[in-house]
Amino acid sequence: MAKLKITQVRSKIGGNRKQHAALASLGLGRIGKSVIRDDRPEVRGQINVVAHLVTVEEVSS
């Protein structure tokens, strides 16, 4: 299964509750923090909610 490296590049200040919850469920909360998650539909949906706050790159397993 492919992996995604998700990095927060913009602040969550000014975002709505849905965006705050999506960042928290991804394990993000600070600018510059990165996490690696499986490439699953659930994770892709959370990324779509905060796409303007994060960068996503595919990494090899």
UniProtKB/Swiss-Prot annotation:
InterPro entries: Ribo_uL30_ferredoxin-like_sf, Ribosomal_uL30_bac-type, Ribosomal_uL30_ferredoxin-like
Annotated Pfam families: Ribosomal_L30 (PF00327)
GO (cellular component) term, any one: cytosolic large ribosomal subunit
Lineage: Bacteria, Bacillati, Actinomycetota, Actinomycetes, Streptosporangiales
One Gene Ontology term from the biological process aspect of the record: translation
HAMAP family for the chain: Ribosomal_uL30_B (MF_01371_B)
Name of the protein: Large ribosomal subunit protein uL30
Annotated GO MF terms: structural constituent of ribosome
Self-association state and partner proteins as the record states: Part of the 50S ribosomal subunit.
Keywords: Ribonucleoprotein, Ribosomal protein
Family: Belongs to the universal ribosomal protein uL30 family.
